[in-house]
Amino acid sequence: MKIRSQVGMVLNLDKCIGCHTCSVTCKNVWTGREGMEYAWFNNVETKPGIGYPKNGEDQEEWQGGWVRDVNGKIRPRLGSKMGVITKIFANPVVPQIDDYYEPFTFDYEHLHSAPEGKHIPTARPRSLIDGKRMDKVIWGPNWEELLGGEFEKRARDRNFEAIQKEMYGQFENTFMMYLPRLCEHCLNPSCVATCPSGAIYKREEDGIVLIDQDKCRGWRLCISGCPYKKIYFNWKSGKSEKCIFCYPRIESGQPTVCSETCVGRIRYLGVLLYDADRIEEAASTEREVDLYERQCEVFLDPHDPSVIEEALKQGIPQNVIEAAQRSPVYKMAMDWKLALPLHPEYRTLPMVWYVPPLSPIQSYADAGGLPKSEGVLPAIESLRIPVQYLANMLSAGDTGPVLRALKRMMAMRHYMRSQTVEGVTDTRAIDEVGLSVAQVEEMYRYLAIANYEDRFVIPTSHREMAGDAFAERNGCGFTFGDGCHGSDSKFNLFNSSRIDAINITEVRDKAEGE
């Protein structure tokens, strides 16, 4: 057992109002500079829709994530090491700028400098790439906002698989939900596996995935390898960049910028302990519908004395263990089974989870709009948002986990409504979904009236315990045994011998001794 800690996030889609505050603040802090105008580390999509970039969830087109071979092993969908290397100079599956959008501003100066004339001057769009005026804007990061555009285009959404989607093009059957998206900081990141230069790494202390800007060579294979398309190429610097989970804030115990500024208070941050030795086993699960449950088995109970003892023995700080015990992410994902991972079928074991949307249905149910099931709760399967659509997004097509989460949220509402409105304690609904009174009241506190300290439980990092990483700078990415730490082999891709790597630490220590 190799115990590691990860700072995870849960987003409650039941409360997201689509205000884009998270997107704007993230943009202003991290990507408001030349070369990254089109990049949105955090963006809010309206579903159903093809997303950003266009058809980003279609892995048949973009070749992201992992696939399981017949021998039971997984490999990047993009190809093996040799297959990835052959795409270095010509990658046919990397999104182009038109798959995102041509970033633009408006010619505001013309409003002030235009000469006197018959007509009011207008501010025409101007490209932020070449500075030239654009004929018209044809796409954007939130082009499908509030179901913008015709249904025929939005119907290409991959989450409509196994659904008769034609009926949802009719006005009376239409539905909509918001989906904030950011880097998932996966336990099994495919972007790390597809980077030939070894520039992408996952931090052991908090699980945040970062790109070493010194080692990045701009091959852009990580962009193809990421199934969530949350790595962007900076055309100015020639490097790839991605969400850094605001790690300078996380290290000091503060939430990410998107979480801090969220108007709807939908975001929760907390620590999860997991067994790193079980990651490959979980990601290699044969059936895609079982991936969610296998990922849950990777996580460890922070209240288990044996887990605590082993974690301390392996160097996990005490404050991290205590934070894991109070983690809202663990409560929602593991205790209450409300939060689900985004597209577990990609086999990356994502660590940004989502509570499926339920609102607004109470008045609709009271008016008899929802058929009754055998128990107290109405038939969740008859909600306006198709359960199969949510399952395709959050549980690899398995409707069971989605129905369980929705029924538990509905039961919580039924129980709290009976207390506050009717003045009685009706436990029939929560008994039906297998929850206790204590669990439901705690769920209500976290989902409805949580304080700042409840939503964000982030331990400060122990930089004094970090080892000297300087000696690891001479590590490399893809290798055939002839380039890392002085090793050598007969095969060399570039037909030339490589000198042994120089251990800078030894040279420095020797110089200090002299």
Question: Which stretches of residues belong to each language-model region?
Answer:
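Non-ligating segments of multi-cofactor redox enzymes
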Residues: 1-514
